[in-house]
Every structure is written in C-alpha cells, then in structure tokens.
Amino acid sequence: MRTMSRYGITRIQESRVEVPARPPPVQEAICRGPKSPCRFPFSILFSTFLYCGEAASALYMARVYQKNNDFYWMTYTIVFFLVASIMDQLTLIFVHRDLAKDKPLLLFMHLILMGPLIRCLEALIKYFEVWQKAEEEEPYVSLTRKKMFLNGQEVLLEWEVGHSVRALTMHRNAYKRMTQIQAFLGSVPQLTYQLYVSLVSPEIPLGRVLLIAFALVSVTYGATLCNMLAIQIKYDDYKVPFHAPEIICVTIWRSLEITSRLIILVLFAATLRLKALPFFLINFVIILLEPWVRFWKSGAQMPNNIEKNFSRVGTLVVLISITVLYSAINFSCWPAMQLRLADRDLVEKTQNWSHMALHYTLRLLENIAMVLVFRFLGTRVLMNYCHTFICVQLIVAYLISITFMLLFYQYLHPLRSLFSHNLADYLHCVCCPWSSRVRSENAESTPETQLNRGVV
C-alpha cells in the first residue's frame, strides 16, 4: 500500500507495523561535577621507594662482587643500574620541561641520580600545602571534560582543576612514565642477570635476594601500570575507574607471565651459555625494527606533534627511545598496546584481538621450545632437581597467566561495554568460523531486518 506522509515522502508499507522515524540527535548534556579532589601521592611514594631500594641493593651487590673479585658480575650489575637511572632522570626532566626553567639545584639533583627523591619531596610538600588550605577557595586553571558510565548511562562530566591539583597530576604522570622505564629497561635486565648469577653461583647472599625482590616487585608494578596506562590512552575521552578486583586480576596475570617468562629465559641461557645470545639479539632486533618497517611501508611522514620545540633530530631521538621501551616491554610480556609510528597518537587505539592472540601464541611456542632445550640439553643445570617437573610448572604458570588475561578482558575490563566484539566473540569466530557465518546469516534473515529492507 502506498501512502503519503506529512513530510511529503512516499512510503511503501508491506505490513501494518509502523516503523517510527529516527528522532533528531539531542545535544549531549554536561553534568557539572565537584572540584577534582587532591589525593595523597601514594604511587609517587611507592615508585620512589622501589627506585631507592633497587639502587641501594644494586650498589651493595656491586661492592660484594668487587670484594670477591667478580668484576664481570660487578660490571653488569652497575651498567643495568646506571642505564635505567639515567633514563629515569631524563624522563622526569622531559615531562616537567625543566630545561626551559631556571632550576639549577633540581638539575644538579638529577645529575647525581637523586632526581626521583627531590621530585617526591616536591609532591609531598605540594600535597600538604593543599591539605592545609582545603577550606580556601582556589581559582581553577582549567576545565576537564570526561565521559563516564553512571547507572549504565553514559554522561559527560565537567569539573574544575586547580593549580595545585594540576601540579600533582603532572608529578603522577611523570612518575608513571618513569616507573615504566625503570621496570623494563632496568629491573627486567637486572632481575634476569641476578637470577642467572644465582643459578651458576654456589651461594646466594642476602643482598642479591633483596635486589631480586625489589626488581621483581618493580617489574610487576610496572607491567600492571602498563595495562592501566594503555586503557587510559586508548579511551582518552572517558574517566576510567579502576577497582580492587580488576587490579588484583591484572597483578596476578602480569606476575605469573613475567616470572615464568624470565625464569625460562634464564634456564635457556644457562643451558646454552653464549650460544643463546644470538637468539636473544635476533628476537629483540625483530621487535625493535617491526614498528619502523611498518612506518616505512606506510609512506607516512614523521610525526611533528610530540613537542613543539623539538627539531626533527629531537623528534627522532624521542621516537627511538619510545621504540626501545616498547621492544623491552614486548620482549618480556605483552605491551598492552601496539606502537604505530605513522599515527598521530603513536599507538593503535582500537582493541586489536588479533595482535594479542598472535603475541601470546608466538610467546607460548617460544617458551615451549626453550624449556625443551633445557629439558634435553641442560644436564649440568639444577642437577638435583627434576627437569621435567620444572618445565611443566613453568608452562602451566604461563597458561594460568593467559587464563587471568582472558578473565580480565571478558569480565573485569572497566570499559568492556565499549567493545564492538568481546573476547568470546573473537575466540568463537576463530575456532568456529562456520557457526559464526551461520549466526550472521540468521541475524540478517530476522523479521526486523526484512521489514527494514522493505521500507523505501
């Protein structure tokens, strides 16, 4: 039946079901929230504690190695400590943009590798100043708008940010990046090396135990923080809440993943000694060059939005540093995001399930191959222990970490409602492509779909 609507549009009706027209878009309402609260900088204090603890234990072990005439072990212990410490100082200076400011005392503290301590004192002093002036009205310097889910509904929140809160936020952001560099450029090599020394050395002093403990906590904390930063970067328009179950799940996942991976690397290196070095170098170089090869194939130009005062050489140095950090993370665990040098944001903001599946598949095959080498060739390593039992334990620990990863992304991700397809859909599509195709065909043949096709 052909009818004429009040807008003058001819409509063909094949049934008596009336299809309502889509309402015009409504302007999104903005909810004014309270002023941004000033929270105690626990994360800054904890990062400084890990930095000082790892530095003190590394210097102590270097002194012990020197007394025992183990100059080879002493050299590597100091090198791993110095590389991470220097990168930490440069990160804090870069984020706070201190080179353009007249702060000679602060730069001197960074020069003697004490920058995190003085920055922590600055953050604590700023917090207590704000706490004492809590009753006073502080003029805000900016307005922040973020989307958030309240009672299942997406709302846009707007709140004022004062100068003191903004300064503390800058301190937190700087320490988050410093923690990543400390964890993966310092703690991972230090932890791997000290585990190797413990494996080939007849005794384990208390100082080495403390150094291993600090490095392990630093790596686990850095990997957990890596997940949170990845979520915040991917969903920059949203205020992301993190609760205790999510943090506990990510911590268990990351601790099992990194611990099993590093122990497997140590056993593999202890089995093959210098013959294992080409495998490690080739693996790391492939991870390091992969983003640049993709950037070269895309034909894109070098991004110029990293820092407005940087030249092309400065931008290139920053991109190389980011790539080295990304490769170090990727070598020991999943980096939680994919580096895209051709994009403006330098990372891929979409949820790429294929990248995650490919990473864990390759790492699982690598780990299995390395434990098999240890099982059949490591006759002189851990002679008083059952090699088969150790291999099974390590592979099971890695599989358990993957299980916690699946649990997090399927049920505990703070913004899982924004996923167009969740993890279960991806696994169902990969494992059962025929049933997925049948399900999509059935969805296309529903009465609602046929009715919409019949409307002109």
Swiss-Prot record:
Keywords: Membrane, Transmembrane, Transmembrane helix. It is a multi-pass membrane protein. It holds the Pfam family XK-related. InterPro entries: XK-rel, XK-related_adapter. It is found in: Membrane. The chain crosses the membrane at residues 40-60, 75-95, 105-125, 209-229, 276-293, 316-336, 356-378, 389-409. GO terms for cellular component: plasma membrane. Belongs to the XK family. This is XK-related protein 2. The lineage of its organism: Eukaryota, Metazoa, Chordata, Craniata, Vertebrata.
